[in-house]
Amino acid sequence: QMISKTMIFEEVALALQGSDMTQEQIRQRVEDTLKVCGLYPFRNWPISALSFGQKKRVTIASVLVQQPELIILDEPTAGQDFRHYTDIMEFLRGLNEQGVTVVMITHDMHLMLEYTPRALVFCDGQLIADRSAAAVLCDPELIEPAALKETSLFTLANRCGIAPAEDFVERFIHEDREVRTHGC
């Protein structure tokens, strides 16, 4: 919906048109960005030939080509199946490891637990928490005022008498990720 060009290369280069960069500098920057986004092999393809997840990466590449220090994404995995959800989140994790700050707005509590080292919670326009995702989602004093949902892992920890629940949730998410990633 935010794509305005037909071809991948043209779409990513669009933000640099009219800058003081030469065409060669633009070409190099776009190619470098497409490599980071895993789209370089498709650089001369029409955008219509891409999957939904690849199209999302094109829109992200269109921002990254400008070399921002920060990107803000609203529901980056909305409408994607689990495979594409995982692909886009691993891609964003890689960007973050390369020094790009990634801020996500999400209602997906599993995404929040698995992929964010830090969660900011706002209520009535005020910041009410700045902690780990597990700490936020295991704090009944935050869940209600921020209209968050108690996770099933927090409920399980409480019902089984596992304390602190936050540690249990973090360990479970870590183990789940290990099994999916390495099969063990």
Describe each PLM feature range:
Residues 71-74:
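Catalytic Walker B motif of ABC-type/P-loop ATPase nucleotide-binding domains
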Residues 143-184:
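ABC ATPase nucleotide-binding domains
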Residues 112-114:
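A short, surface-exposed alpha-helical micro-motif characterized by mixed small hydrophobic
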Residues 46-50:
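Conserved ABC ATPase signature
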Residues 106-107:
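H-loop/switch region of ABC-family ATPase nucleotide-binding domains
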Residues 126-153:
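Conserved beta-strand-loop-alpha-helix hinge in the C-terminal portion
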Residues 13, 24-42:
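Conserved ABC ATPase "signature" region
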